[in-house]
Design a protein with these regions (language model features):
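Short secondary-structure boundary segments
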Residues: 64-67, 183, 205, 240, ...
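Acidic, Mg2+-coordinating active-site environments of NTP-dependent enzymes
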Residues: 69-75, 198-351, 430-440, 507, ...
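ATP-dependent carboxylate-amine ligase
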Residues: 1-13, 17-20, 30-36, 42, ...
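Phosphate-binding loop of NTP-binding sites
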Residues: 91-240, 244-253, 504
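Short, basic phosphate-binding NTP loop
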Residues: 1-114, 122-133, 267-268, 330, ...
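Short, conserved loop/helix-junction motifs that constitute active-site signature segments
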Residues: 55-57, 75-77, 194-197, 227-232, ...
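Well-ordered beta-strand positions
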Residues: 36, 61, 200, 235, ...
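Residue-level signal for inorganic ion chemistry
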Residues: 4, 35, 54, 95, ...
Length: 512
């Protein structure tokens, strides 16, 4: 306890200084004996209101602010030391690193990926490539957490700081060699990766999203750029296909390796040739000193070429030589790994795909990726927009769907506490305005609830058509007015296809 007091500038009196602290928690319901309970101010209640439960569960001490201390002074139970600091959130990350000993010079080697789109797939690609290299790996991300064993469900793209450091400590105990982590802008803003030092940080792209949090693209960029500073990363790999990547490459505070998927944007590594192969792509990656790597990804879309290329260059930046990496690419085909809810194929005829595309850029790329070359094939898309999020992207998503699909079925995503009909109306307005202004030949429908929309898409589909169900990907719950309703797009799509007599693909990750 004394070392914790020293770290936050608080003197621990008497015998309390010898109290052992073995963990840290922000949630009174997850406190274990020996934990430091951090009582933070919340949107409705202060964490200090729940200190009694934390102490009863075995909390060794409480860390809070002045407001929390005043609430604790009213409590009859002050049997544990109380540490008071001005901004407790600011010290949670460093304290977590100290308590779990997950600081700068400890294993595993850590790869962090940020950007608007592609974080999940890139971290899966990194993990798969590292495994092909014979390394034991971990993963922290939107879909799951892996620590060398069975998958652990994840509710946040990046968990809270104590959980992140606890997971890194667990990975060290399991003697894992490396881990890949998604790093969202929310995680940086809410200090969930404070105290974490990434060996290699990677940047995918930046497009409109999360402006409900960041308000402007400049603010959004500034948050992402915080990852590329000496306090958070040793090296960086930056994709410079967009202006934000080029800006980041020029301003990052750590050594940068650049990557481009086009010769139009000069970079250290460039995708120089692409050849379609099945659903995926074979491509060459040309780098310094005339180095050329032959790479294949089995996932469709030019964006997955970018994701695979970023994974390759990040692993190279992590210290693997090009010849060893090429051998792993040849032997393991690591970028054909299935990523749940990311361009996930449920049926081949009709082609039926579920993808997480939930913003304008991702939806456009997904629609372009799944469009069949068959001249008589129609593209049917089912999607909606999330409630209580950036409202400006709703009509833009509707317009993009109208331009790129033959049949647009607008439905509900996660309304949260917003009116679902109002959200649909925003998306519909964009689709119908584009349809009228640009004289687009598409059909625009409004169908709800979401399972009915998926059924309608299947009813309309012929064997040579394509169905894209976009926006939710791997998610298995739909939040409506504070209630979580069971809803998995993959399950609904498989069920509707089966009912119509189509042969669906088997996947043990889809629980039908």
């Amino acid at each position: 306890m004394e070392s914790i007091g020293d770290a936050v500038g608080v003197v621990i009196p008497g015998a309390s200084a010898d109290v052992a602290v073995t963990g840290i928690s922000l949630n009174s319901r997850t406190v274990e004996p020996g934990d430091l309970y951090v009582a933070l101010p919340g949107a409705v209640r202060h964490g200090a209101d729940f200190a009694a439960q934390a102490i009863e569960a075995g909390a060794a001490a409480v860390l809070t602010d002045d407001a929390g201390a005043r609430l604790l002074a009213l409590s009859s139970d002050t049997s544990v030391p109380v540490l008071v600091v001005d901004a407790p959130r600011n010290v949670v990350g460093p304290l977590s690193a100290m308590i779990y000993r997950s600081g700068q010079d400890t294993a595993p080697q850590l790869f962090g990926v940020t950007g608007t789109n592609g974080k999940t797939t890139t971290t899966y690609f990194i993990t798969s490539l590292l495994r092909s290299l014979g390394k034991r790996t971990g993963l922290i991300g939107t879909i799951e957490i892996l620590a060398g064993g069975d998958p652990i469900p994840s509710l946040l793209t990046t968990p809270e700081s104590p959980e992140v450091h606890g997971l890194l400590a667990l990975m060290r105990e399991k003697e894992l060699d490396a881990a890949a982590m998604e790093v969202s802008s929310h995680a940086i803003s809410y200090q969930r990766v404070d105290g974490v030092l990434f060996d290699v940080a990677g940047f995918t792209n930046l497009t409109q999203d999360h402006l409900d949090l960041h308000h402007t693209m400049d603010d959004y960029f500034a948050t992402k750029a915080e990852l590329f500073t000496p306090a958070r990363a040793r090296k960086a790999v930056v994709t410079v296909d967009d202006e934000w990547g080029r800006r980041l490459a020029g301003s990052a505070g750590v050594p940068v390796t650049t990557l481009s998927t086009s010769r139009a944007n000069p970079a250290d590594w460039t995708v120089t040739e692409t050849v379609p192969r099945g659903l995926g792509t074979e491509f060459t990656l040309s780098g310094p000193g005339g180095t050329v790597l032959a790479v294949h990804t089995g996932l469709p879309g030019s964006f997955n070429v970018a994701n695979a290329a970023l994974a390759v260059v990040m692993v190279l930046a992590g210290g693997v030589d090009a010849a060893t990496l090429q051998a792993a690419l040849d032997a393991g085909d690591p970028f054909t790994v299935a990523v749940p809810g990311r361009m996930q194929l449920v049926c081949e005829r009709p082609a039926a795909v579920v993808d997480f595309a939930h913003n304008t850029d991702a939806l456009a790329r997904a629609l372009e990726a799944v469009r069949s070359p068959e001249p008589d094939s129609r593209l049917i898309v089912v999607f909606g927009a999330t409630g209580q999020r950036d409202q400006g992207k709703r009509p833009a998503m509707g317009a993009i769907a109208a331009r790129l699909a033959d049949t647009v079925i607008i439905t509900d995503d996660d309304p949260h506490d917003e009116d679902a009909a109002a959200i649909r109306a925003d998306v519909l307005a964009g689709a119908r305005e584009a349809q009228e202004r640009e004289e687009l030949p598409c059909t625009v429908l409004e169908v709800f609830p979401r399972d009915a929309a998926i059924q309608r898409a299947v009813e309309l589909a012929r064997p040579h058509d394509t169905i894209l169900v976009a926006g939710r990907g791997h998610e298995v719950w739909q939040e409506v007015k504070g209630v979580n309703l069971a809803l998995d797009d993959r399950v609904e799509l498989r069920s509707a296809l089966t009912a119509r007599g189509f042969n669906v693909l088997q996947d043990d990750r889809i629980e039908s």
